[in-house]
């Protein structure tokens, strides 16, 4: 049996991005944000996420500069870390996830929290100037914001895409409140440039896609 379908990788990408730009309303987004959002939509298949995006307008510039300077990428889940394309990273940046570290369960038990939240404690030495990608656990984002409020860090950018029915909405609302203003188009974050998707939607693929988009724009 022969099935007629598009096989050429470059043609598939080209057609995909053309479809996204046709179907998604990117007209109100700054050009650098729009380019990242195209990659984000490509990862999730949902063009309607544009209306739920909240960001500080310096997030792309800050993320690019951080990666160029060799900043580590701190991930809340292995799925996020595995989704980051190493060959795109401009400075052989480390991609780190501490959830599987043998000391993480001990820390989680001590703190009476999730492993994902406890893993943030291991980020502390590398948090300043890092690119943080949260694509799974709301507890990670909550704890990160607590740590930043304590005066630790801050990272260069926060990519906040926790997903789910418990804590995802609230953690992203706190991110917006703490790092910007409660407005869909934030001029400048008060503390840390960020990009997030309000509501329950998110996921590892989204978080990794944004890291890849930032990295791709820096690759010469």
Residue spans for each PLM region:
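Long, charge-dense
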Residues: 89-130
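A short, well-structured juxtamembrane/interface segment
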Residues: 51-66
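N-terminal glycine-rich anion-binding loops that anchor highly charged ligand groups
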Residues: 28-42
